[in-house]
């Protein structure tokens, strides 16, 4: 699995639309759409919000975090 698929999995596991997920983590709908399509990656602030969301909803976060670190190292 790759980063875009993992973001989408986290969102879908919570039964949220892209708009709802964006509202919860404090970003624009278009931002979530770009993450899920692989056109961009979250910054550190967004990753912290996603982490908080995952912890609050008992969703594993570690895989997403590893993908994000790998992306930052490759960049």
Name each model feature, range by range.
Residues 61-75:
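Short, charged recognition helix plus adjacent turn
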